[in-house]
Regions:
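Patatin-like phospholipase
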Residues: 1-204
Length: 204
């Protein structure tokens, strides 16, 4: 998995095409001589790329899940194919939880270092250890796209104007709901560091 960052790399149309090159519908796109496919086939929510970025700073992170894995039990082979794709591209809650634990350890190190006597805190070896601490707060806003109409297992290659417009609108409305709730203003435990925010499902 390779992350391209506009702060370090010069991004071109090839990078955009590679980020949407889902096999087998699209071939890999070559960048610097290497073939790349959509990173979603490996990790659809690589939150570690944000939490490990240096210099680390408090952030509001929008984690977007395009396909909703919740729903009824599959009743046919086509339903199974649909569910398989939803699971494949779902955000990994275990991955987010792992990053939450790691960031909590950074906060614990920082809190412990604040309670050290000055003469101990000044020791070079202690300063080196204290540098692993961090006091940033990361608000992860989980956006899950609602199901749209009669979508099936081919929805990831549906580039019709109707399909694209429907997903744009659904995503816009979900983002508006999240922004209106302003969860990043909520207080976070000093030890935690990572707060995961979700929205209740819409009832229609």
């Amino acid at each position: 998995m390779r992350y391209f960052d506009s702060s370090r790399d010069t991004l071109t149309a090839d990078h955009v095409m590679a980020s949407a090159a889902l096999p087998p519908a699209f071939p890999a796109v070559r960048i610097d001589g290497e073939p790349y496919w959509d990173g979603g086939i490996y990790s659809n929510t690589p939150i570690e790329a944000v939490l490990d970025d240096e210099p680390r700073r408090s952030s509001v992170i929008f984690s977007v899940q395009v396909w909703n894995p919740d729903g009824p039990e599959p009743q046919s082979v086509l339903d199974v194919l649909d569910k398989q794709k939803e699971i494949q591209y779902a955000s990994r809650s275990s991955q987010i939880e792992q990053q939450r634990k790691l960031h909590r350890l950074r906060h614990v190190i920082r809190e412990l270092s604040l309670h050290l006597p000055p003469e101990i805190a000044a020791l070079p070896e202690v300063r080196d250890l204290s540098c692993w601490g961090c006091g940033t707060t990361m608000h992860v806003l989980s956006l899950v796209a609602p199901r749209i109409g009669d979508e099936d297992h081919t929805k990831d290659i549906d580039f019709s104007s109707i399909g694209i417009s429907a997903r744009w609108q659904a995503g816009y409305e979900e983002a508006q709901r999240m922004i209106a709730s302003r969860p990043w203003e909520s207080k976070v435990d000093v030890i935690e560091g990572v707060a995961l925010h979700t929205l209740p499902p819409l009832v229609k």
